[in-house]
Amino acid sequence: MAQFFKAKPNSSKQLSAKLSLSVNQLDHLGAGIAQHQGKVVFIPGALPDETVTVQLTEQKKNYARAKLIKVDTPSSERVAPECPHYHTCGGCDLQHMSLSGQREHKEAALLDIMAKFAGAEGGTLSPALTGEGWHYRRRARLATLFDKNTKHLSLGFRAASSSNVVPISQCQVLAKPLSDLIVPFAKLLNQLSAKASLGHLELIAADNGHFAVLRITKALNDKDLAKLSAFAEQHQIHICLQDNEGQFQGVGAELVLPVYQLLDDKAESDAVSLSFTPGNFVQVNGQINKAMVAQAMDWLAPAPDERILDLFCGMGNFSLPLAKMGADVIGVEGVAEMVTQARVNAKANNLDKLTFYHGDLSADLSLEPWMGKIDKLLLDPARAGAFESLQWLKKMKPRKVVYVSCNPASLARDSAVLLERGYRLQQLGLIDMFPQTHHIEAMALFELTK
């Protein structure tokens, strides 16, 4: 009878054993990398040049994962995390590393990915777009968890790789006025009779005030509405409710939309503002978003009457400033609600050289009314990237392409397409949109050479 080899499962003895390892680098997700018995070992929380005591948690053929038990020899980049919830909340994962160290790591990781997967080693490395390391988030969504036994509602963030809600009293990366509202909101929500029917709470800091969006699964009674209204007045915040159908209703007043300015240091006549409904996507780091928009304008250098295509345009984060500078701009977005809001924003900013379309940018674009020769192209896709859209470069033939990316892996893949089509990487720069986390965003400029 034939006998087949069956790999033995990880023994409890193997996994419970404690090891002393030397960490030599970070992976792209911010975990320390060490070597043990010919395998790569990933250690969240460990830093390069550290000697650490770890416990293996997972063994695979070519790699292992381990839990950090103790830092025996700390790195010069190691710092004490500022947030008391750091080791339980799933939001941040690099607070134990200096801000300068984080940025150096992210920049090196970006260059490594681009060289390895795109073969893109040319071009000029632009200075990273950086800002405040703490209290930079102007928007956050807090989860709620109602305990049927204690009748208590917890308000916080979800733990890493878990649906468990970690109650928090503050958030060191959330705008300070919003962070200061967490405890008062938790107290308020526990006073509502409908607390078992409450969903997430979203907090927003905008240029025209502070906002809170409370998700509800059933209508609130008058007493609960009165409590919310009194809270809004006391804390000078706009509160709105979002029902099961996704509709929004203001509490104690008409619904007010948050507004952001997109460009800094502009005279009133040159200002560009963007309003949005609470359900729309916006960049959470306002300081970096302004710098990012300014850099995109500088790299694209839009001239009057140039035809510029903005794919994955959202509500006009880049389209509006491009049109303000005199270009004929076409914005295309896959989410219909955001296209509607983009048109509202164009009208509010008195921009008439701007047209928005709704469309699936992963589909056949050959018959789209906007498809054709353009002067310049801006791309700001989601994490999946813009691979399908770039297949139509021959029809568009832009002289310049600015690619704004929230995923270096898809940026590298798509950069390879651009390089194959005769474009050269001219500029590449890190965008540190999310300090204290491993997340890497970037901007790249390509120019047609043939």
From Swiss-Prot:
EC number: 2.1.1.190
SUPFAM superfamilies on file: Nucleic acid-binding proteins, S-adenosyl-L-methionine-dependent methyltransferases
Annotated positions binding S-adenosyl-L-methionine: 283, 312, 317, 333, 360, 380
Catalytic activity: uridine(1939) in 23S rRNA + S-adenosyl-L-methionine = 5-methyluridine(1939) in 23S rRNA + S-adenosyl-L-homocysteine + H(+)
Annotated ranges, domain TRAM: 12-70
Protein name: 23S rRNA (uracil(1939)-C(5))-methyltransferase RlmD
Record-linked InterPro entries: 23S_rRNA_MeTrfase_RlmD (IPR001566), MeTrfase_TrmA_AS (IPR030390), MeTrfase_TrmA_CS (IPR030391), NA-bd_OB-fold (IPR012340), SAM-dependent_MTases_sf (IPR029063), TRAM_dom (IPR002792), U5_MeTrfase_fam (IPR010280)
Residues bound to [4Fe-4S] cluster: 83, 89, 92, 171
An annotated Gene Ontology molecular function: RNA binding
GO biological process, one term: rRNA base methylation
Pfam families the UniProt entry points to: TRAM, tRNA_U5-meth_tr
Enzyme class: transferase
Alphabetically ordered keywords of this record: 4Fe-4S, Iron, Iron-sulfur, Metal-binding, Methyltransferase, rRNA processing, S-adenosyl-L-methionine, Transferase
Known function: Catalyzes the formation of 5-methyl-uridine at position 1939 (m5U1939) in 23S rRNA.
Homology family: Belongs to the class I-like SAM-binding methyltransferase superfamily. RNA M5U methyltransferase family. RlmD subfamily.
Top-level taxon in the UniProt lineage: Bacteria
Active site: 406 (nucleophile)
